[in-house]
A protein has these predicted regions:
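Hydrophobic alpha-helical transmembrane segments
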Residues: 111-118, 144-193, 356, 360, ...
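Interfacial transmembrane-helix starts/ends
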Residues: 5, 72-86, 207, 275-301, ...
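Transmembrane helix-bundle signature of multi-pass secondary active exporters and lipid flippases
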Residues: 45-53, 243-262, 294, 324-331
């Protein structure tokens, strides 16, 4: 995987830059809004994100499954943005309609706040489909720039609003929605995706194929975000504000792991199915090592800085991060498993693990939130994520013939990893007093 080093480094830089700006933005929001205000903003964004994640019809999974047929690649590319805008518009309209229906129930945000958030859904859908194609085309530098400029635009808007005294729940939501337009503009202008007349027949076939996977995709999203809806309904915006900040900080642990998964995605589609299984196992072993290092670093860093940065009102966030990080890292390290199962075009083995984990998550949240609030929510999430990965590992082993122990790094691999980390630290003079 030596040829992956330049794109890995660039994507890592892009994700790190995005992360820094995201943290800066979250500090600005936390200092301007109390936990209740952050909870209201995040619920509006969560509704829009739900429209994206439940309404995308799993087209990006269908794109991945069809990419191995080289004759379809050009049309899949040209279809990505128009299809995303069309599907996204339908999803946004449906989300606003449901928002109207549930006004006054379950602490649902104001309808105009929901309309503002959902205005970003069509562009967000175009970004979702377009980014997947960009990565499949091995143009990781474009995906990185799109990610970086989007975060920069959102962060700049929040800083300007803060300086001018215009920062409010509505302007925070508006900045979030507008950031998708920046990302989509970069993807198209920089050649990540091609804008030309779409192939309507293939677009229809892609949607139909995606629907075969969509129950699993919907369950996977609800696995990640149903906890926010349940926490909002059972505990209220204050707990949502603290919990969602913890989720944002816990996801720092995904940085290196997600980047490595993105830049190695094309490797899983280069060879025969048998070779792909071996490559997948090698990728996962390295991602486990990255994940453990990232988890420890994240928990220690958050414990040290959360109160000075965000204020005493968010002090409980550090405890929630410690409960969330193991599940978040495990979920990220398992991404190559999903890609392998998608390549095998076995919709059942993609759908069933997500549905099972969702049932576990909802059941545990319903039981634990009334007793333990946000802490119970974090515990339920980590247990559910673990159950998802366990099922995916079982299906991978059955499909490929590779045992689950082969997905764990060996002692020699761990030694090489730690030696390399120490060498890099010495080069940076880390840990020296002078």
């Amino acid at each position: 995987m030596a040829d992956r080093k330049p794109p890995f480094v660039w994507m890592l830089v892009a994700r790190a830059g995005t992360l820094v700006m995201g943290i800066l933005a979250s500090v600005v929001v936390a200092r301007a809004l109390p936990p209740e205000g952050r909870g209201t903003y995040y619920m509006a964004v969560t509704v829009a994100t739900a429209a994206l994640s439940l309404g995308h019809l799993s087209v990006e999974q269908a794109q991945t499954a069809l990419w191995s047929e080289k004759g379809h690649r050009s049309s899949l590319d040209s279809n990505s943005v128009p299809l995303g805008l069309g599907v996204g518009t339908a999803a946004a309209v449906a989300a606003v309609g449901l928002g109207l229906l549930f006004q006054g129930h379950g602490n649902m945000p104001d309808i105009w706040l929901l309309v503002t958030a959902c205005a970003g859904v069509p562009m967000g859908m175009g970004v979702l489909y377009g980014t997947n194609i960009t990565l499949l085309r091995d143009r990781t530098h474009v995906a990185g720039w799109a990610m970086l400029t989007s975060a920069a635009a959102q962060c700049l808007c929040l800083i300007v609003f803060g300086v001018t005294g215009l920062l409010s729940v509505w302007t925070v939501v508006a900045a979030w929605a507008a950031s998708y337009a920046v990302s989509l503009g970069v993807l198209t202008a920089a050649g990540g995706v091609t804008v030309r007349r779409p192939d309507l027949r293939l677009a229809r076939a892609t949607c139909l194929k995606g629907l075969r996977f969509h129950a699993g995709s919907a369950a996977a999203y609800l696995l990640l975000r149903s906890d926010v809806f349940l926490l909002n309904a059972l505990a209220g915006p204050h707990d949502v504000g603290i919990y969602t900040l913890a989720v944002t900080l816990a996801e720092m642990s995904r940085l290196a792991v997600d980047v490595f998964a993105q830049v190695t995605l094309s490797l899983q589609f280069d060879d025969t199915a048998g070779d792909s299984a071996v490559v997948t196992a090698r990728i996962i072993r390295f991602m486990v090592l990255l994940g453990v290092a990232s988890a420890v670093t994240t928990v220690v860093a958050v414990s040290a800085v959360v109160t000075p940065l965000y204020g005493q009102a968010y002090a409980d966030t550090a405890t929630l991060v410690a409960w969330l990080v193991p599940g978040v890292v495990l979920l990220s390290a398992g991404r190559p498993l999903s890609s392998f199962l998608l390549r095998a075009r076995m919709s059942r083995v993609v759908v069933l693990p997500s549905l099972t984990a969702l049932v576990v998550n909802v059941g545990l949240n319903a039981a634990l939130i009334p007793a333990w609030g946000a802490v119970g929510c974090a515990i339920a999430s980590t247990v559910a994520y673990t159950s998802l990965i366990a099922l995916q590992v079982a299906y991978f082993s059955r499909t490929s013939g590779i045992g689950w122990r082969c997905l764990l790094p060996t002692g020699a691999e761990a030694t090489r990893f730690t030696t390399e980390v120490k060498r890099r630290c010495r080069q940076l003079h880390l840990g020296r007093a002078a």
